[in-house]
Amino acid sequence: MSIAEEDVFEALRVVEDPELGMDVVDLGLVYGVQLELPKVTITYSLTSMGCPAGAMIQEQMRDVVSSLEGVGEVVTDLTWTPPWSPEMMSDDAKFVLGF
């Protein structure tokens, strides 16, 4: 079975930013997924450079994606370009968080 980008995004919905209580996909923190199976690269950002949960979020992303069938290596690529902003959140996240 081969996986698609959508499968990776769906798997990442279980990874939450504990400060905001929302998943990294709805928060707009996952900028992209590149599949070169068995390697998956996740390009992502955090809500701030000083995010205390950054290492935990990165580890959880690696763990959940590496559990997908066909994935042998997960690379996480933290970027600050473009900088994250609340406008990147899904409409549901904006509603829940009052934006």
Task: Please place each PLM-identified region on the residue numbering.
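Domain-level signature for proteins that mediate thiol-based redox and metal-cofactor handling
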Residues: 1-99
